[in-house]
UniProtKB/Swiss-Prot annotation:
Its EC number is 2.4.1.32. This is Probable glucomannan 4-beta-mannosyltransferase 11. Belongs to the glycosyltransferase 2 family. Plant cellulose synthase-like A subfamily. GO terms for biological process: cell wall organization. The active site is at D157, D310. It is a multi-pass membrane protein. CDD domains: CESA_CaSu_A2 (cd06437). Probable mannan synthase which consists of a 4-beta-mannosyltransferase activity on mannan using GDP-mannose. The beta-1,4-mannan product is the backbone for galactomannan synthesis by galactomannan galactosyltransferase. Galactomannan is a noncellulosic polysaccharides of plant cell wall. Keywords: Cell wall biogenesis/degradation, Glycosyltransferase, Golgi apparatus, Membrane, Transferase, Transmembrane, Transmembrane helix. InterPro entries: Glyco_trans_2-like, Nucleotide-diphossugar_trans. It is found in: Golgi apparatus membrane.
Length: 570
């Protein structure tokens, strides 16, 4: 009975279907959709990807030309020994005054030599620098310079009252030793680092100073730092800035720090050297440099309109006709961020800020009348467009999007020189900065491609002035934190101890309660999966031969996405 009933229902449905005025033919609908998709692909997708290929190849060639130019300049500098002290006048401070005094009057000669030392301000901006505050303060207070001709200024924006107390006591300790050190705080953090530096220049004692040496909290200059840098400013009135090289105390801590060392060594050894030698301009690195105060005033002082106040000041100073000199022989020890979280925040600031500054100053640069046409072209094209925009965008668009997408589109052909030869030459040009890490080049390139996702998002944010454009997160420094031994009871609590007093201060528990899903970086995971799928498609269908690159690049995205890079903070 149930079967006959079921058969009757089926017959009724068939009768009603047959009476419909328009019969739905699913195969025809599918064919229509396929035809529409093919038409859209031919009319929109393929031309768009071809345009991206052309733009990517053009930008890659621009970057190659810039790297070859930098390499040629640095080769010439080394071949002809065009050191800074051969291009500019350099004499030891006080030597001329001492020589001019009577040889019979040794005391008057020493007095004259001491008087020849200019007044120097040493600024150290800080923000909750619990692990490293003693490093820069101790190094600054140990600089070889007449004690009555230098002022150490600690600009503490800390919000942690315990840290504030520690920093103030450290300043008082050095003050008790006869060092002219000033501990300065302000009521708010307006303008972040730029605001602190600007506020620091308003004190009356600064009016007596001619030059400013700047160090971040983790930087440790050698005692002869001022003796080797200030003479360039004293004997060359056209020089506004002397920038020195960073040297990293924790470069061998993990792969993340090794990769950073490779990138920054190239930046200092080649990019800064070339800019100084040819154009007398480069981007101020924000620390380990000495400024002429008159040049800062002439450029309009510190501005907090972007997160790269150091680059902002440098560009405005060079547009006023001032020159910069890079002294690579002087190295200042510093710390690299060893956690991926800290590194991401730093790279966001370093990518977003320049793009935002370029947008604000592109017209001003072209309209400037005080610098030569070629200097304006270098500033606009080489420094900003190629160095800060193209380099941050083409890496992701080309290697992480265009090449994987081309696997799915047989109509797209990328020339071999654009896939192999040009990228190889660019990589080799950059890898020479750290010969000891040459065996890590492939891993370094893969990691840089992964970071390009973060950098392109930051650059777009800067250009559009959206979202986190003015976000300032101080780069976390671990100091010796990773060497801290766990408590005897097995807990993760860490007591903050003043190593000189050897008595605990206010104990502060640091508990890691990060939810496991907060550790992952989902955009990197998504891109990694897409690239690996493209690799499988290439193996099975496309046969373009990109699959080896796609597999290892996708794996690199997944490794970073699952946070298997850097060290775990204590």
């Amino acid at each position: 009975m149930s079967s006959s009933g079921g058969g009757g229902v089926a017959e009724e449905v068939a009768r009603l279907w047959g009476e419909l005025p328009v019969r739905v033919v699913w195969a025809a609908v599918a064919a229509q959709w396929a035809a529409a998709a093919a038409a859209a692909r031919a009319a929109v997708v393929v031309p768009a990807v071809r345009a991206l290929v052309a733009v990517s190849l053009a930008m890659t060639v621009m970057i190659l030309a810039e790297k070859l130019f930098v390499a040629a300049v640095c080769l010439a500098v080394r071949a002809f020994r065009l050191r800074p002290d051969r291009r500019y006048k350099w004499l030891p401070i006080g030597a001329a005054a001492a020589a001019a005094s009577s040889e019979d009057d040794e005391e008057s000669g020493l007095v004259a030599a001491a008087a020849a030392f200019p007044m120097v301000l040493v600024q150290i901006p800080m923000f909750n620098e619990r692990e490293v505050y003693k490093l820069s303060i101790g190094a600054a207070c140990s600089l070889d310079w007449p004690s009555d001709r230098v002022v150490i200024q600690v600009l503490d924006d800390s919000t942690d009252l315990v840290v504030k107390d520690l920093v103030e006591k450290e300043c008082q300790k050095w003050q008790g030793k006869g060092v002219n050190i000033k501990y300065e705080v302000r009521g708010n953090r307006k303008g972040y680092k730029a605001g602190a530096l600007k506020e620091g220049l308003k004190h009356d004692y600064v009016k007596e100073c001619e030059y400013i040496a700047m160090f971040d909290a983790d930087f440790q200059p050698e005692s002869d730092f001022l003796l080797r840098t200030v003479p360039f400013l004293v004997h060359n009135s056209e020089i506004a800035l002397v920038q020195t090289r960073w040297k990293f105390v924790n470069a061998n801590e993990c792969l993340l720090t090794r990769f950073q060392e490779m990138s920054l060594d190239y930046h200092f050894k080649y990019e800064q050297e070339a800019g100084s030698s040819v154009y007398s301009f480069f981007g101020f690195n924000g620390t380990a440099g000495v400024w002429r105060i008159a040049a800062i005033d002439d450029a309009g002082g510190w501005k907090d309109r972007t997160t790269v106040e150091d680059m902002d000041l440098a560009v405005r100073a060079t547009l006023q006709g001032w020159k910069f000199v890079y002294v690579g022989d002087v190295k200042v020890k510093s710390e690299l961020p060893s956690t991926f979280k800290a590194y991401r925040f730093q790279q966001h600031r370093w990518s977003c800020g320049p793009a935002n500054l370029f947008k604000k100053m592109m017209v001003e640069i072209l309209e400037n009348k005080k610098v030569s046409f070629w200097n304006k072209i270098h500033l606009w094209y080489d420094f900003f467009f190629v160095g800060k925009i193209a380099a941050h965008t083409v890496t992701f668009i080309y290697y992480c999007f265009v090449i994987p997408v081309s696997v799915w589109l047989p109509e797209i052909e990328i020339p071999l020189w654009g896939v192999v030869y040009v990228p190889t030459v660019i990589t080799l040009c950059k890898a020479v900065g750290t010969p000891s890490s040459f065996h890590l080049v492939i891993l370094w390139v893969l990691f840089e491609n992964v970071m390009s996702l973060h950098r392109i998002k930051a650059a777009v944010t800067g250009i559009l002035e959206a979202g986190r454009v003015n976000e300032w997160v101080v780069t976390e420094k671990l100091g010796d934190a990773n060497k801290t031994k766990p408590d005897t009871n097995g807990s993760d609590a860490v007591k903050v101890i003043d190593v000189e007093l050897t008595t605990p201060l206010i104990p502060k528990l640091k508990k890691r309660r990060t939810r496991f899903w907060d550790k992952y970086h989902y955009s990197e995971i998504f891109v990694g999966i897409c690239i690996i799928l493209s690799g499988f498609y290439d193996v099975l269908y496309a046969k373009k031969g990109y699959y080896i690159f796609l597999f290892i690049q996708g794996l690199a995205f997944l490794i970073v996405g699952f946070d298997y890079i850097g060290v775990c903070p204590p």
